[in-house]
Amino acid sequence: MKRIVTLILAAGLILGATSAAQAVDFKVSGLWQHRVSFADRNFEKHNGDDKLRAASRLRTQIDVIASESLKGVMFFEIGHQNWGKAAEGAALGTDGKEIKVRYSYVDWIIPQTDAKVRMGLQPYVQPTFTGIGSPILDADGAGITISNQFTENVSASLFWLRAENDNDPEMTKHDAHDAMDFIGVTVPMTFDGVKVTPWGMGGIIGHDS
């Protein structure tokens, strides 16, 4: 796994270097909300809930497009910031540390192929019958996804997700067996009136997984 990841990283750096002289397009999109509400959310007396609430939030996505074969995406989140709450940077004086990075990935196509690679912080969603969200895996994480369209009806994606590693907040433990990785594959198939997606996923916990 280490060797494969190293080769992919090297290929990504080479591809980025060859595209450095080209023009880059920036596309920015997002959502900026401020809201004020007054409501009795708890009918018990002396419940301590505030009836008047105000909050702000910001969602911003920046697409950096070098070519049809190379693109980077950053997605920032600020808030919810409930007005007056110091822990969320919305009390008197503001200056809170509320900027969060949701996505930070690079999309690129392997030269001379149709295979697409996504590397970095990205969404991971396993197929589900309802289409609402998978109860198995529906979250953002860090890893690599490789996808390819083999025929008009069949495609496939292979992913590696580094879920956990070195998460002792005090850094007092030196457990070499604290890495958690997930490896999975999905094979979407579409035919006349039928769409199915066989998939599988496995997890590994241990030293560098």
Locate the predicted segments by residue.
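Internal metal/ion-chelating core segments
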Residues: 155-209
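Beta-barrel outer-membrane channel/assembly domains of diderm bacteria
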Residues: 2-122, 144-158, 187-194, 198, ...
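Outer-membrane beta-barrel and related beta-rich outer-membrane complex signature
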Residues: 42-44, 86-88, 131, 168-170, ...
